[in-house]
């Protein structure tokens, strides 16, 4: 499966990923398990990573494959190096649900698209479980196929609720390779938020061979 395949990525790619670990913008020294150099006990700072994935009907199998590859890299990246990082998996159609790792990567689900539902659930979980003493990070993958009031409402919620409580937020928008205009209304709304913030980054991807470079660019 995808996780097993990712585990067998070339040694060069894995070594490069690990070499960049200490330059990753969203995990600085306070997120790392303290390495005692002076024999004085120090607290272990805690970090949580929210993984949000669109699994609606507009996300065809190719797009879902791209999203799963992105999150598999993220999963391996964090679990290989940071045992103290909690991972929260949220998938959404027109409603959102928290699921385990296996369901997130493997279960099939489809429906309409309400991006806001995933952001709202992420914030609810953050407030209930990770309100104090946690460094919060999030990564979202979607084709941006949201309509009506959802893009603007989602961007407003991101700006007003999630970003103030988040150290680093990334958005990956997926499109078919032959798509001429890769940017959705959701992208346009998010872009305005990202430009005004210092902790939000956005990228596009259309092919499998773009996922690793995009991931590396986001987390270098």
Locations of regions flagged by a protein language model:
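Acidic, polar low-complexity linker/tail segments
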Residues: 1-50, 59-61, 83
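Phosphate/oxyanion-binding active-site loops and adjacent basic polyanion-contact surfaces
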Residues: 26-28, 63-67, 111-119, 150, ...
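Surface-exposed acidic, glycine-flexible loop patches that form ligand/cofactor-binding
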Residues: 40-42, 80-81, 127-133, 160
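…and closely analogous acidic/polar surface helices at protein-protein or active-site interfaces
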Residues: 46-47, 57-89
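DG-centered beta-turn motif at the end of beta-strands
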Residues: 51-56, 135-150, 174
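Short acidic/His/Gly/Ser-rich catalytic and metal-binding motifs that mark active-site loops
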Residues: 96-101
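Von Willebrand factor
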Residues: 103-136
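Von Willebrand factor type A / integrin I
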Residues: 157-220
């Amino acid at each position: 499966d995808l996780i097993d395949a990712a585990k067998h990525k070339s040694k060069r790619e894995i070594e490069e990923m690990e070499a960049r670990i200490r330059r990753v913008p969203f995990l600085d020294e306070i997120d790392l398990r303290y390495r005692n150099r002076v024999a004085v006990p120090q607290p272990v700072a805690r970090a949580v990573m929210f993984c949000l994935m669109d699994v609606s009907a507009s996300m065809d199998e190719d797009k879902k494959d791209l999203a799963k590859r992105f999150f598999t890299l993220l999963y391996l990246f964090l679990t290989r190096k940071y045992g103290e990082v909690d991972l929260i998996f949220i998938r959404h159609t027109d409603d959102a649900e928290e699921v385990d790792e296996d369901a997130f990567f493997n279960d099939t689900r489809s429906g309409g698209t309400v991006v806001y539902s995933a952001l709202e659930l992420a914030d609810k979980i953050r407030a209930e479980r990770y309100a104090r003493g946690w460094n919060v990070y999030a990564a979202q993958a979607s084709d941006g196929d949201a309509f009506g009031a959802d893009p603007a409402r989602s961007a407003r919620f991101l700006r007003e609720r999630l970003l103030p409580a988040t150290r680093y937020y990334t958005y990956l928008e997926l499109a078919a390779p032959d798509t001429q205009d890769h940017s959705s209304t959701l992208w346009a709304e998010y872009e305005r938020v990202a430009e005004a913030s210092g902790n939000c980054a956005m990228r596009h991807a259309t092919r499998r061979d773009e996922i690793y470079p995009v991931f590396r660019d986001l987390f270098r």
